[in-house]
Amino acid sequence: MKRIARKSLFAALSLSLLAGCTIGGPDSGPVAEDNPPAASPENELFIYTVYPAFYVKEDVFEKQIGQLIKKKFPDVTVKHVHWDNPGRRYEDLIAAGTIPDIIIDNTRMNVQRYIIDNDLHYDISDLIKKYNFDTSKLNPGLMAQMRNLSPEGKIYGLPFNNNDFVLFYNKDIFDKFGVDYPTDGMTYDEIYELAKKLTRVEGEITYKGFSQNPGHYMNYNQLSLSPLSLTEDKASLSTPEWKKVVDNLRRFYEIPANQFDTVETFATKANIAMAVATVDHIVSFHEQNKNLNFDVVSVPSFSDAPNTRYQPNVYSMYITKQSTKKDLAFQVMAAILSEENQIELAKEGVIVPLETEPVKEAFGQNLPQMRGKNTKAIFHGQTAMPPAARAEGLVWYDVPMQNVFAPLIFKESKDSVTALRMIEEQSTKEIATKKAATETIDKAASKQ
């Protein structure tokens, strides 16, 4: 009853906000039961994209998704809206009663707080059975994340694009210092030894052996650790496993002269020998510096978890509870995940959940920036499994994992245990505040 009452109160707030001002973020309350989706033609499918961010360009969406749907479903008209400010955020659509049929969004960051908390989620398990869709053909790590959104293993969506990571390396720096290039399947210990050899100061140039975004490293850690307790409303970082993860990265930072800057300067400054970044940087680094002599290999892994990629950084497709076209929506999603269409998306540099040999071979074929690059590195090993599902009803909070390193380790020289404990305590307080605010809203709603 509390949740139902909260829906009405949040919807009213959303309407008043929409009428009165521009809203700063895509946060909103659940859909009101008396605010049904606006009627639309039976052959129109409303797709709302938040991630991938490049779907803000309609021509990219049309090329990768729109044309695919038109080819398979010629009688279907696609209405596409991409998250934007103002007027195109979750709360705006909810307030207007224009609920999408399919939402494509970042699973780790947004599904709990925007889709589930807004009561837009829908268990598609029956549709999977009805259309005999084989989920086992998809990347197991990505499907595990789909199932782990619910402690009962309900499936609210299917993966679309995994924005995965690789290790970039500057061949010229390796050649300059006579060091052999890295190879697929190397461990952090091996990469650390390379980083020490490649970190040097020559005149006014500081060559950095290794760089890494600490937030990405922590959030998508390869040991499948969760920063949140799976059973209680609190953070959970004071463990030997988390210390192991932190100690592993901080040793790179503590190599003299190898203090991390940002991986984004890999191409522009060209003084970083190795850097972990998302695969799409193959294109962006090339465009930033067409003379950059670089290639990629698989991300380093822990010696006791060899050949393990990062946890899923996946953007997934979700059918909304409010959609009146769930069957059509699912058939469209299934068509997108067919090998034929996965190959076409892979050619455009989309890391798709289907990892058959034809898909791997097709990756990046339509992108001249990827020609000659070791794109097989993207598929080396297996995706790390995501953490298990949390208990029902727990507050979701995006623990600022990057703060363990910046500023606590990088600027304040905290030891690993202290840095982890400080972020754990700060996050637990924020979770308590968020929980109290929710309880206040529940009380207000119950009085209506």
Regions found by a protein language model. Give the residues of each.
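Conserved N-terminal structural module of periplasmic/extracytoplasmic solute-binding proteins
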Residues: 3-118, 135, 290, 304-305, ...
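Short helix-initiation/N-cap motifs at beta->coil->alpha
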Residues: 81-89, 186-192, 258-269
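Extracytoplasmic/periplasmic solute-binding protein
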Residues: 150-160, 165, 175, 189-235, ...
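Glycine-centered hinge/linker elements that transmit conformational signals in sensory
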Residues: 232-261
